[in-house]
Amino acid sequence: MWIENKIFQEDMENIAQAAYIPWEQLMHKTLFITGATGLIGFNLISALAYVSLYKNIPLKIIALVRDEEQAKERFQEILATEAPLKFVVGDLENIPPVSERIDYIIHGGSPTASRYFAEHPVETIMINLKSATHLLELARKNQSDGFLFLSSMEVYGGIHCREKVNEKHAGFVDTMVPRNSYPEVKRMVESLCACYADEYGVPAKSIRLTQTFGAGIRKGDNRVFAQFAHSAMQHEDIVMFTKGGTERDYLYTADAVSAILTVLLSGKAGEAYNAANEEAYCSIKEMAETVANLDIIKEKYNGPVSVVIDESKNDGKMYPPELYMDLDTKKLQQLGWNATRNLKEMFTRMILTMV
């Protein structure tokens, strides 16, 4: 998949060419990354390896992984090069000691499935809180140059009217709902980052990512955007288990990587930044209809296909209530960042890397 794929190689080159990313700050630096084998982590590590190999930005990447063999498979094409990537085997609850000085930490590891939040709320809280505390301590002891926590738009809670949501928006989260373990602990970790910045001088920041997808998804990815694409590619109806009324922005994987690096290197310590493509705002149903009618689905997969709503399997626990999440990204844009891919492009490029 890596740079042998035209789409993925183009993504890596676009990230490397982003003039607003101060790449020189990463020269001869070591980055510690969690969530390495996930969609965002994979794209992030790929981009860092790319600039190291092809853009004369010497750096080191240390990735925390649970299963070294699976990680080797995930990154096999990168490992076949001279890319400066090595693995530390452990999990978020038991992060092993790292002997090298760590200059930057990007904490992207976390459970991400709604079903997991609902069925394992205690573990959701403890894994996030323990891992963040451990890594912030690591940053403090190393006097690291930067720490970035990958947070979520879910920290804003349920917003039931259409309005722009900036970083100062105070949304409501019902703490008595177990599934809300996820947004609540994300809020707590954001606060912890701000506190470490204030009390200990750790340059910790948070980035609130909207739902992100694009090149680099795994074959078995079961998230909604992947389900929609798989159904359309197999010429099957796209079946939804809610009315799909929730509206939000989306973000392409490469745009997420450039946003992460921008906040890590140029963001202000103790602050949070929204990351989304404001032009890719739509309902889940509208997103499904977009996929069903993509040109690539018509041309290569005998499309279009139909969108069907079947709420018979929805017990009300697995899906958050209908809401609106239109993130305001002016604060991030002031650092020079901008999104580059619209919704149709996101899906088209994702599908072209799934083939």
Task: Please place each PLM-identified region on the residue numbering.
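C-terminal substrate-binding subdomain of Rossmann-fold SDR/epimerase-dehydratase oxidoreductases
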Residues: 1-4, 232, 236-355
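N-terminal Rossmann/SDR dinucleotide-binding element
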Residues: 1-104
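SDR active-site strand-loop-helix element
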Residues: 34, 64, 105-108, 147-153, ...
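NAD(P)H-binding glycine-rich loop region in Rossmannoid oxidoreductase-like domains
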Residues: 89-127
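Active-site segment of SDR-like NAD(P)-dependent oxidoreductases
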Residues: 111-115, 153-160, 210-213
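Conserved Rossmann-fold NAD(P)-dependent oxidoreductase catalytic core, especially the SDR/UDP-sugar
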Residues: 133-180
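NAD(P)-dependent short-chain dehydrogenase/reductase
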Residues: 159-168, 191-248, 253-264, 284, ...
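Active-site helix of classical SDR
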Residues: 181, 185-188
